[in-house]
């Protein structure tokens, strides 16, 4: 984030921000932050910030349901300038969204991504050659007893292709930056699921 701001980015959109306080910790003159999350979370966050008498002049709290809302519309109503470069952050978000919702999210973000924008996303990745639906089903059964909240885990190439389809080029695509998230008991040996950190820049408007 600090590198993006130092490079001239003047808008930061935190997708699924929750109670993240980076908009306050890293505030800079001339930089507008947009924190997006579910309506109940945004309402509670606003109440807490007001109770603390926190200056949120440069912070816009915007309610969104990623399963039903168009992120592009939410950003437009919040005052985001689609003609100016933006840093979009999505940490530990897409794992909890259905694949169709992830696609719609990326499309909405891309439509508001001016040239020079950056997308920093945490994506859950399984080894190549495995069936993503089977992975999700196994996660659901083994970890959550059939009531799992995790919905989108893909092979790295699938993530790279999806980024490309929406006008994003992953930086240093051959270099993997990741942490091991959890293992699954499948076939002859456990399958390791990673949380990979993907940073991409716009190659065209979405």
Language model: regions and residue ranges:
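Alpha-helical subdomain
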Residues: 1-206
């Amino acid at each position: 984030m600090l590198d993006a701001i130092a490079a001239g980015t003047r808008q930061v959109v935190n997708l699924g921000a929750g109670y993240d306080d980076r908009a306050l910790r890293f505030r800079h003159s001339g930089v507008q932050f947009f924190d997006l999350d579910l309506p109940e979370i945004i309402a509670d966050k606003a109440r807490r910030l007001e109770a603390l008498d926190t200056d949120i002049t440069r912070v816009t709290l915007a309610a969104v349901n990623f399963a039903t809302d168009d992120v592009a519309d939410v950003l437009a109503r919040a005052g985001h300038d689609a003609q100016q470069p933006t840093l979009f952050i999505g940490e530990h978000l897409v794992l909890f969204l259905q694949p169709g919702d992830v696609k719609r999210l990326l499309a909405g973000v891309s439509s508001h991504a001016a040239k020079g924008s950056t997308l920093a996303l945490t994506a859950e990745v399984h080894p190549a050659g495995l069936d993503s639906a089977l992975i999700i089903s196994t996660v659901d059964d083994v970890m959550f007893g059939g009531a799992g909240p995790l919905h989108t885990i893909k092979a790295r190439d699938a993530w790279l292709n999806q980024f490309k389809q929406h006008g994003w080029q992953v930086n240093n695509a051959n270099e993997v930056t990741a942490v091991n998230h959890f293992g699954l008991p499948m076939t002859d040996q456990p399958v390791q699921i990673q949380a990979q950190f993907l940073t991409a820049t716009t190659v065209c408007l979405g």
